[in-house]
Amino acid sequence: MQNLAPWESFFMFVNILLRDYEPVKRRQQGSESNEVMKYSFTVDTLICRELFRSILKEKTLGILGDYLNRECIFERTKKLVKLNYNDDEYDYDLDDILKIRKNSSGKLIVDDIDQAIFIIDHLSRKVDCKVFTKKSLVGFRHIEKTITEAGYKIRERRSIGLDWYTLLNDIRTSCAKHRTFVAFSKYRYVDFIAMLTAFHQVKAAKSNEEEHLSTIYSLYPFVEHNFDEDKEDAATTKQTTTTTTTTPQTRTRKRQATGDNTPTPTPAPAPKPTTPKPTPAPRKISSRKNGGLTNVRVDHISVNNIPTPSDTNESLSPPSTIISSSNSIKQCLVEVLESKGEISIDKIKSIFNCLQNKQYTGDLIDSMFQQNKSEKVITISSKLFNMSNKVDYDEINFAKLKDDILYLSRRLIYEKNTNLLIPTEEGEGIIGFLWLPVVNGALTASVYVSQLGADVDFKKISATVRFVQLCISMSDIIGFMELRSLSLDAFRSIANELLYMSDRILNLEADLRTLKDIVMKPTNLKKHVNVDNLFSRLSPEGSNGFANYLYDFISNHPYIKIDKSQNSIKLKETPNPVLVLTYDPKVVEHKVGFLFHCRSEISRFNAGGNKFILNNIQHSFTPNNIGVLSQDRENDLKRNYSMLTSNTSKLITGTGSGEHNLERFISITINNTAYDLIRVVLFRDISNGISISNLRDIFRENSDNRNRYLEYLGKSRLIRVFFIAPCLIQILEVNFAATQLTADKNFNRAIKSIKIRNLSYITIDIIVGGNVIDSIRGDATQVVQINASEFSFSVSCLKFSVSATLVSKKNLQNISTIVLNKYNEEKSYLQCVKKFSKLSKSFIRKFTGMNININALEELLLSEAGAYEDDDDDEGEGNEDDEDNDENEDEDEGEGEGDSSEDEDE
C-alpha cells in the first residue's frame, strides 16, 4: 500500500485490452451454466475473461475447452456442485446461498466450490496480501494447514485447492509472456481474482454531495485526511507535521495556510554541514549516582559551558553542544509493536481510561512508575529534542570510537530500570513532556503528553528515542569493555577484526567444540589434535580471542548490529511504541495525579527562562477530554491515504470554525491490496446501516427471492463489490463518541462501537491500530467496541477502512464546481500526454529514417575507402618491380638511372 492510485487508473490498462480484444458473449439465453463466479459478471469482466481465454488457447496450441468452466477446471469435483442454476428461471433459494452449516464440533461445512475457492483465496492473502502478484507462486500445500486450523471442513479440499492453484499458475505463466502484460510490469504476474475485482469496480448509490466527495477522495487518494474541513484564519494557521513510528520511511502530512490557493508543499530544509570546532579538554559533568544522560554525537562533540559540580545534588547537567558534519538524520519512524518488558500498552491504556472516566488518584501514575521497578526519574533539558535531531545515526560506527567519546560515554551509564522525563517548550502555562521508561536496560512504551491542537513533532520524538537507544548501547559497550578488561584501542582492534572475520568466527566455534570433545574424551582425540596449538589459538591474551565474545554481545544486543556492506558496527532501527496523550487546557476544573508526581521534576524546566505556572496547569488540565491517540491507530489511517501532501491538500478552503458549520460523513475506503487501487465512498446518512455485498437485484418482481433480497438488504446503503462467491457483510449500527458535534474535531471523529453482521464463510477480523480487537465468524451478529477514529477489515483482496470525515457546509456548496474543474484539468493533462505521445512517435520515426540514411552513407564511405586501398596496393606492387629493375641496371655501367628515377616519380 505504498503507492496508492485511484481505481480509475486501472482502466488505462483496460483501454489497451479493448484495442486488442473484443468481448464474446459466452452464456446463451436459456442455456444451463456451471461457470465459476456466476451472476457476478459485468461487461468489463467478460472482456477480461475473454482475454484470459484467448491467452490460454494460445498456450494450449488451439486445444478447445472453456478453461473457466467449473466442470473443465474441477474434473474430479464436478459431482460436488450443489446448486444447479438456470439462466431463465433463477430457480434457487437465496437463503440456501447464504446459509452456513456447521458440524457438531463447530467447524464450517463447505461443499460449494465457489465458497471453497473464496476461503482458499482469502486465507492465502491473509499472510501476504500480494502473494499472487509475485514472480513465483507458492503451492497450495503451504496454506492447507491454515485452512484446517481456521475451522473449515471443505469436502475434497486438496483436490479443489490443487486444481485452483494449477489454473492460477497457467494464467500467470501465459500472461507473463503475452505482449499486453509484458508492457506493464505492474500487471505482468497476474493476480486473477484481484484483476477481476478491479474490472468489476466498486459501485454505490449516493446523493450528489456524497458522489462528489467520493469522487474527490477516490481520484486523489493521497489527499490529506479531512482536507476539506474548516481551517483557522491564515494568519494563525500553523504548519504541522504528523508521522507515525511504524514505517521505515518518514511520512508526513502538512496543514498549509488557507490564504494561498496554489498548493506549494514546503519540506523542512536539511541543516547544512558544519565544520567541527576544536574540542576543549573534557571536564567532569555533574550527574547522579550512576551518571546522567548527556547529549552526544559519535563523530564530533564539543562540550561548552559545563560547570564543575559543587555538590552531589542530582541537578540536571547542562547539555553539550552537538556539531555534526553530516546532514539531518535520516529519520525512520519505527514500527509499532506490543510493548516489551514489564510495562505493556494495555496497562498504559487502562490508566488513561481511568483518567478519561475521572477516576484519578494521587497514586495513579505512581503505579506506572512502580511497574518499572524504580521511582527514579531522570530529567533532561528540552534542548535534547533539537540536538538529537541533528545527529545522523546512520553514520555511527561503534568500531571507530574516539577517546573523547569514550570519556563521555562512561557518564551515560544509569540504572537498568529508570524513567527519563524530557519537557517540551510549548509556551507559558502549557505543559508537555516525553516519558521514556527503561526496563531491564531497554526502552518500552513511551508516552508523549501535549496540549490539544499543539504541534506534535514525531520526527524529533523519534530522534530522541534513538538517542536514548544510542546511550543504552554506549553504556552496554562500556560494560562489555570493563567486563573483559579491554582498553579502547583493544576494543577498536577487536571490532575492526570482527568485521572481516566471519570465517574466523566459524573456525573459533569449531575449535571450541573440539576443545569440549577433548575434555570429555581425551583419549580419543588427543592423538589427532595438537592441543597446545589449539589452546594458543583460543588464548585470550591477544585481541583475536575476544572476537567471538564481541560477536555474541552484538548478536544479543537490541540496538547494535554488524553491517557487513559498510564494514561497520551500527545502531539498529528498533521498534518502540509511542502513545500520545492530549488535553484541552480551557475546559477543566480538576487536578490530575500525575502532575503531583512530576511536580518536582517539572520545576526544573525553568532553567531556560520559561517558567511553568504549576497551579494554573493543574487547574486547566482536562481529564474528561484526554484522548489516547495510539501511533498504531494513526498508522492504519496514514496507510490508507499515505498522508502525503498533494495538489488537493488545499483544494477546498474556508474560514471560521464551530460545530454548527460542519457535517459528519462516514468514509469507507476500499483498497485493492494486490494492485494498490483505491476507491473512497462517503455516506452522510447511515441510520439504516451499510451493506457490502456482491448480490445483485436480478430477481423477478414479487418473487420469493426478490422479497428475501429486500429483507436482507433493507434500506441500508449498499456498496457492491466483486467477490468470487456470495457474500454479505452489514454494518448495522455505528455509534459515535459524540452524538452531537462539538468543538473537538478529534472527539467528533471517534467511533465508540459498531454492530456488524457477517453472512459469509469468511471470518471478519476487526482491526484497530494494526491489532485485531475482535473476530466475527460466519452467520454471526456482534457488537464490537472500537473506541478509535477508524477500524478496518479485509475480505479476499479488498481491505475496507471505515472512519469519519468532517466537511464544512460552506465547502459543500462549492464541491460540484471543484469536481468539474478537476475533471477539466485531468482532460488537459490527458491531451498533453497524447500530444507528447504523438511527438515521441514522430521523433522516433524520423530518427529511424535518419539512422537508415546514416547506415547507407557509412556503407558508401566504406566501399569508397575499400576501392581507394585497392589502388594503393597496385601502385605498391609497381614500385617493387621498378626497384628490381634498377638493381639489375646498376650492374651494367650505371645506365638507366634516369629511367629508374622516372619510375619512382610515377
From Swiss-Prot:
Comp. bias (Pro residues): 264-281
Q: Does the keyword Phosphoprotein apply?
A: no
Q: Where is the composition biased (Acidic residues)?
A: 867-906
Compositionally biased tracts (Low complexity): 236-250
Write the record's keywords in alphabetical order, separated by commas.
Plasmid
Query: Membrane-spanning regions, if any?
Result: none
> Origin, by domain of life?
Eukaryota
Chain spans, region Disordered: 231-322, 865-906
Q: What else is known?
A: The expression of this protein is suppressed by cAMP.
Q: What is this protein called?
A: Uncharacterized plasmid pDG1 103 kDa protein
At the highest ranks, the source species' classification is:
Eukaryota, Amoebozoa, Evosea, Eumycetozoa, Dictyostelia
